[in-house]
Amino acid sequence: MKQSLFLKKCSKFCYVLFAVCGCLACTQNQKIEWPQVTNETKPWTRWWWEGNAVRTTDLDTVMRKYQEANLGGLEITPIYGIHGYEDRFKDFLSPEWVDLFLYTLQEAKQLALGIDLANASGWPFGGPWVTPEDACKTVAYKTYQLKEGEQLSEPVRYKEEGFVRLAGHTPVKLADLKEPVSANADLQTLALDQVRYKKELPLIIVTANSDKGECLDLTSKIKPDGTLDWTAPQGDWTICALFQGHHGKMVERAGPGGEGDVIDHFSASAIDHYLSKFDEAFKGKDISYLRYYFNDSYEVDDARGESNWTPAFFDEFQKYRGYDLRQHLPALLGMDTPDKNARVLYDYRQTINDLLINHYSIRWQHWAAKQGKGIRNQAHGSPANILDLYAVSDVPEIEGRDLVSIKAAPSVAHTEGKKLSSSESATWLDEHFQSNLGDVKKALDLFFLGGVNHIFYHGTCFSPQEAPWPGWLFYAAVHFHPNNPFWEDFKYLNQYVTRVQSFLQDGTPDNDVLLYYNIADVMSEQGNRSLQHFSGLDRNMLESSVRESAVTLTENGYAWDMISDKQLLKTNIEKEMIVTPGAAYKTVLVSAAQYIPYETMEKLMALADEGATVVFYKGIPQDMAGMILSEEKQAHFKEMLDALDFHAEGAVKCARVGKGKICLSDDINALM
């Protein structure tokens, strides 16, 4: 049998792995054997159902080919259809679609192939059953300046001019679209990416803030024609008016029956209403063989503007932050002092963070858990701490080619004690049919180095047997399907992946350093957008000291995992080790942070007091993040810092704290 160069390299890798295992066996005086092969130790693939145009006769054939290629499972993702096959299209979650899904589950069970299902036809969550009330929102604003005795000379109104963005090539004019978007026929052909209708936006609130610190709610003084019936009293006044808009983001690459508005991810009722469609479709059906539901990244704001509002935001803000944001709108809009602007903006973004976790991720996971299932979630791109979003997921999933960013999902799997962390793998490596299996293996090895142990190829299109070569394709794929010339050798790559994943899944994480994922500095930064979106250590974290530390640790051979504020609060000390629910670490590293949450600093001091070594790179944070209204917390924060008595130990300065110590240096290697 002919083998390509990459397969020879696979064999060499396995030889080295066996050699290492042999050494371990000699050292520990016990025999190490290959763990049992299951469908989870094998690689899986994203399985696009283009147009949902699948047929039972073809399903039997292609699924057997997938099994023979040593794939362990399939993630069904309904997607846009192929031109010329419209007569085969089936609406997502329709009775006909459900019958095909049930048939697929039955066939997969016979072939021992696992099955996951995307919780949307495309991404993000959304569809034609999402009402305008449940669709993603945006906030617009206008500001005015008045002096004593003055009145506004213009009405308080905001007119959305409207626009339409397209994913396809069919010409569409905004004036030709009905409202709501679900009222339009043939959305599959229209391929809408974002729609905002031309209209006047409803007013949320109008406030007036004086230079003396007064704040007035003037909303009730707005007449039906928009006139503000108010004369400014003594002082200089800043008038802020907020308006609620429709963000307009559509489900990307949606298949038939899945086109429509994206949900409001910050609304509990929106996700509940959305998921009820699945409950209705599967009612009375046996979907017990389905393993996990899946979400293909956030990407709500891959659009014009941002989804940065929900109708209950002011009340939610007060619940989470403890003060009334309505009294601080100038700071939210960047019109107060730089310090106050940063603190209020941090609190606004942190509230968005909390709503995304509690109103979307947790409710979604609980919905799946009630069915005896779990969720796989790609959290990257979210306006929230992705480590906390990953922590809610049963299987956190990452993608990309940047090693230190890849470690975000596996880090959470390690610290939280999750068995699996997955990856969307080999996405768009090259142009169509230009990537070979050697390129794929290189991409997979990077994920393994980052700690991923559950590979999902990107991906495999269902293709009917009679479709002319090369069959049905997806635009951003390497094409892991039987029509690809490398298919004959694909099973050998999958054997390699299975062996690597068998040990990775069977092992226990043993990293030494917890790298504090400080996002408070970024969340406090003014910018041209109201939200910050996180994807590990790239994008807005490219210039951060956290990334600098991650790269330095990696280049110098230190094993590390990232940890969030919330996750750090759950740690404790055992035998001078910092213990998380899933692993134990020798130290926690905080990198050049300006701001830090009060609770995090308090926890770091407590860990040191109980025997831990906590190290700070390039200084200790001197300020707390957000609007801290408690004088007690402010005083205690200062006391914690003032109590540190540092003494030089070479390139490192250390201060004893109880049974442990706090160390700082400008040299990471010295701190290690």
Predicted features along the sequence, with ranges:
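Carbohydrate-binding surfaces of carbohydrate-active enzymes
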Residues: W44, R55, D60, G73, ...
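Intrinsically disordered, low-complexity N-terminal regions enriched in serine/proline/glycine
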Residues: K9, C14, A140-T143, R196, ...
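Bacterial Sec-dependent N-terminal signal peptides
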Residues: M1-K31
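Short linear sequence motifs
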Residues: F6-S11, A19, E40, D134, ...
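Mature N-terminal, pre-catalytic/accessory segment of carbohydrate-active enzymes
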Residues: C26-L290
